[in-house]
């Protein structure tokens, strides 16, 4: 190797290494809510900053999640997913008796199966939500034997009514709602998306305990994913406007370290008006 080639490699190699290590996505950030097992989970999300390829998930639980997305083409949707009891990523390989059942689906809701990160059933409702708009979600759980039916409801402010989107039933061993959480995810993952900020506030969360009493969700623990392709440092969470905020990507600066237990003001004495399940 001649002297000129050696100098060229010395100059270029750090750039190549830097390019290879550049994050492809903003880091997924979560709020985990300490709560008892529940028959209903209500939560609100207000998106302040979004970009194509963003998922703002309001009502997550062991076996499913429910929220809003801005897809890669800019289309806005409401999405609700529930997992099969079977393990694996091939949706077609799951035996019929282990697949999620669709007990109810609104006419303008699309439902189908998914694979790739577990398998199960998911539904999509076209809804052009806006930044600054508070979106409201309710998930209920009804146990019958070893199965649980999870119903997803979304509030339509223009009609001032709740819309029952879908009810999925899956094998749970007879469990109700547990392991409650929210998150923000960058699913575009094209490098540029790591440089773009996503910010939302999750507020006024409530759970209905198995015996029927409603309890506010006033604490949440800050968490984040550990995928190697994500930007690790540009994450944040905290308390603002009576709720919990999550932020990731772009020029985000951390004000509270991971694992911080956040506490919001108690707020209302009871949840807002909800549909009768």
Language-model-detected regions and their locations in the chain:
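Bacterial Sec-dependent signal peptides at the C-terminal "C-region" and cleavage site
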Residues: 11, 15-22
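Activation corresponds to long, low-complexity, non-globular regions
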Residues: 22-55, 180, 184, 189-277
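Carbohydrate-binding surfaces in secreted/extracellular proteins
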Residues: 129-163
